[in-house]
Structure formats: C-alpha cells, structure tokens
C-alpha cells in the first residue's frame, strides 16, 4: 500500500496568509495523509508570537490525528537578536515546534529522517556536519531494503536551476560530502524547501555519481513572499514502492487548494523516468 505524504515547506508565520493557512488544513482534512512533513521556516523572524502561531497550527494538525515530522529552517534562527542567534539559535524552535532536531518516522512502507541544516553563522544558507552525515548512514542502514528511504532537510543538498532567471541555486554547505553520504545510505527521495520553488529531478542529473535519489523541492505553502510568479503550493506524494514515486503539486487558486502538475517517477535501475499522469474526467 502506498504511503501518502503531504510535504509542506516555508510556511513563514509572520508573513503568512491566514486564508491560505486555513486552506492547507481543509485540504489535509479531506485527503488524510499518512504523514505531514514540514521542511523548515516555520516563522518569518523567529519571534515568540510567530512561533506561537506556528505551534498552534501544528497542534491543530496533531489534534486532527496527523503525524507530523518537522525540521527547522534558517528563518527559525533569530536574525537581528545577535546574542540569541549565537547563544541559543534554536531555543524557541525547540520550545514551540520540536525538541528533536533529527526526527525519525517509520512505518510498514517508508522510513523518514529529518536533518537540521539551519546554522547561526550562515544567515540564509545552511550547513550539514559530519556527525549528521554519519547519522544518515547509520539510521538508514537498519531499514528494510523494501522500504522507501526519505531524507528531509530545509536547505537542498543539490544545486538546482531554480534561482533567479533559473540559474543554479546554492546547495547546502558541505554538499559534496553530504551527497556521498546520501548515496551510501541508499536514500531514495530527498525532500527540501528554502527557495519557494517547486522542482523534481533525479539527483544524478545534477551531480555526477549522486546515486539513485529523486530530489523533490517544495514551494512555500502559506507565505506571501512568492518567487518567480509561483503561487503557494505543497507536494502530495504517494510512495508506492521505493522505485515508484507519484508526485502531485497542490496549488492555491485564490479560494482553495487544487491539484496541479502530476507526474509518476519510476526508477529503472539507472535513472528516474517521469511519466505525466492524465486525470480522468
């Protein structure tokens, strides 16, 4: 049975649209995902009130029965409060969102690991350290080969053509080593956000010897800070098997969320092949 995953990112409470926030909740209630993943940037400026709003949102999702896996983003680290930024960069995140910076979810068909890439020194860019790379390999080594292995970060591990004018966007710090660790761990799907752009492609097409991962980027789910004329959106993923991933981008239309582009990716042992899904009716 396929695992149904809603992948949201960059919800940015403090620069959000309340109507769109309510729209995500309505859509999730209707579709009933097995897991909700939020890949960072819960707030706009890591302020207490913004974290309280984000916490209330998560509490509503959990009260509705949804399992939630979350990682922080760079906006969840204080920008202007320099003392807090360096002394306790994620204290508010841990208090209001989650104390777990390497969350794990596993069921009969998928294993999901979240990794924190937000740092004090990098301002907007992220970083991954060697202990985290080792953890990726360690956690997935114990997973059954039949399960789909999914890695979640805020900052992408791969440089993709999603920057201004579609130039290559910056990858996370130490990404060369991180990609090797992901390859050794046998990760099938890498989820991230950060750039407020949707994108999906085989890692191998972006980085030589990147292994067999499928890279899936989420746009911003609820922020008013839109880029490249992309409306608010999130990803609706069906992991049928580790080599059979269905991706639908769910897009805000001004009054609610509706299904957008729909592709099914199949791995043939060498490449991920994309096949558009034609909706009936």
Question: Over which residues does each language-model region extend?
Answer:
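Extended active-site neighborhood of metal-dependent phosphoesterases/phosphodiesterases
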Residues: 53-138, 143, 181, 236
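Beta-strand-turn-beta hairpins that frame and shape the catalytic cleft
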Residues: 1-6, 103-114, 144-148, 209-214
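Active-site environment of divalent metal-dependent phosphoester hydrolases
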Residues: 14-19, 44-47, 71-82, 120-124, ...
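Mobile, glycine- and charge-enriched loop segments
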Residues: 1-18, 128, 132-172, 265-281
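N-terminal active-site segment of His-dependent metallophosphoesterases
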Residues: 1-60, 80, 101
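A short C-terminal boundary segment appended to hydrolase-like catalytic domains
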Residues: 238-281
């Amino acid at each position: 049975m396929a695992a149904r995953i809603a992948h949201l990112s960059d919800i940015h409470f403090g620069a959000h649209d309340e109507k769109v926030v309510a729209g995500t909740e309505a859509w999730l209630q209707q579709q009933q995902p097995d897991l909700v993943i939020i890949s960072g940037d819960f707030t706009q400026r890591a302020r207490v009130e913004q974290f309280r709003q984000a916490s209330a949102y998560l509490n509503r999702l959990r009260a509705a029965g949804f399992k939630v896996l979350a990682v922080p983003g760079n906006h969840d680290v204080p920008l202007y409060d320099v003392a807090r930024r360096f002394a306790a960069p994620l204290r508010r995140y841990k208090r209001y969102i989650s104390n777990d910076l390497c969350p794990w979810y596993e069921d009969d068909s998928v294993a999901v690991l979240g990794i924190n890439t937000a740092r004090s020194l990098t301002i907007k860019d992220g970083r991954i350290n060697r202990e985290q790379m080792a953890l990726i390999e360690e956690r997935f080594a114990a997973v059954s080969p039949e399960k789909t292995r999914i890695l979640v970060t805020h900052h992408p591990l791969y440089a993709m053509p999603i920057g201004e004018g579609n130039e290559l966007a910056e990858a996370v710090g130490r990404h060369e080593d991180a990609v090797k660790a992901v390859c050794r761990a046998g990760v099938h799907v890498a989820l991230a956000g950060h750039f407020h752009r949707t994108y999906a492609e085989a890692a191998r097409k972006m980085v030589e010897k990147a292994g067999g991962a499928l890279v899936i980027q989420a746009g911003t789910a609820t922020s008013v800070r839109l880029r490249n004329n992309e409306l608010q959106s999130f990803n609706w993923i069906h992991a049928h098997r580790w080599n059979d991933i269905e991706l639908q981008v769910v897009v805000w239309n001004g009054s609610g969320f509706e299904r957008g582009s729909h592709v099914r990716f199949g791995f043939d042992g060498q490449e991920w092949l994309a096949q558009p899904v034609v909706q009936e009716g």
